[in-house]
Amino acid sequence: MSRKCEFCGKEPHVGNNVSHANNKTKRLWYPNLQTVRHMDKSGAVRRVKACTRCIRTGLVVKPA
């Protein structure tokens, strides 16, 4: 599975590490993805990768 939220589409961002000598090297910032069980509209339960913001705002419907 990819490093992408299935609800909002949040993906890794590219930027630079900057040292005290102002040397720059590329790096990635990853979203805080969690594997959670999600119940879709048909009632089927499946595992999805969702960012913590989508979990907090209620986009992920957890089964009872």
Swiss-Prot record:
Cellular component GO terms held in the UniProt record: ribonucleoprotein complex; ribosome
UniProt keyword Cytoplasm, yes or no: no
Full protein name: Large ribosomal subunit protein bL28
One Pfam family here: Ribosomal_L28
Gene: rpmB
Gene Ontology annotations of biological process type: translation
Keyword field: Ribonucleoprotein, Ribosomal protein
InterPro entries in the record: Bacterial_rp_bL28, Ribosomal_bL28, Ribosomal_bL28/bL31-like_sf, Ribosomal_bL28_bact-type, Ribosomal_bL28_sf
Similarity comment text for this entry: Belongs to the bacterial ribosomal protein bL28 family.
KW Cytoplasm (keyword) present: no
Domain of life (superkingdom): Bacteria
GO molecular function, one term: structural constituent of ribosome
